[in-house]
């Protein structure tokens, strides 16, 4: 994920994917759309090196939707990890994925939120997926605080932190 000089004033960021075969647009566009991104165009380049398998580099010019103006360069590590996980099939591709950029949380926490919503539906929650997603997106600061609280509370590598003050500043 990078930006060229001419891209900054237009709010455009470039995403480059390197793979052994061409990614079909119908496969990648829903992934990017569910992350809240708009794809402006795509430039594929095929690389031929003798004695090696062919590689394809696809460069996409992207930006956030009008409703979600975020600096993609500041979130490029999170974004690239989520795209990779989605392409590999370990990150569900649905509209909850917008929380990754909106709330600035990692993809595995978005997966946790997806699972908690599904569990709630099994228990009889009357709220549909889009209703819950819209509520969470509208309160992205709360989502970020709750996922931060969850990490501090349950991550075994974090010891001795007091969770009582984690959300206080953001929730006031």
Predicted regions and their residues:
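Non-catalytic interaction/regulatory segments
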Residues: 1-37, 41-172
């Amino acid at each position: 994920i990078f930006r060229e000089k001419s891209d900054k004033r237009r709010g455009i960021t470039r995403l480059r994917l390197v793979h052994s075969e061409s990614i079909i647009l119908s496969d990648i566009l829903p992934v990017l759309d569910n992350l809240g991104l708009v794809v402006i165009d795509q430039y594929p380049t095929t690389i031929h090196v003798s004695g090696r398998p062919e590689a394809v580099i696809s460069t996409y010019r992207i930006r956030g939707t009008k409703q979600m103006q975020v600096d993609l360069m500041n979130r490029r590590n999170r974004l690239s990890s989520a795209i990779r996980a989605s392409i590999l099939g370990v990150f569900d591709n649905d509209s909850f994925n917008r929380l990754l950029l909106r709330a600035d949380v990692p993809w595995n926490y978005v997966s946790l939120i997806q699972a908690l919503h599904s569990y709630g539906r099994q228990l009889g929650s009357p709220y549909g997926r889009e209703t819950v997603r819209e509520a969470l997106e509208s309160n992205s600061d709360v989502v970020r605080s709750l996922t931060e609280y969850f990490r501090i509370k349950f991550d075994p590598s974090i010891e001795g932190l007091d969770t009582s003050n984690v959300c206080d500043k953001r929730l006031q």
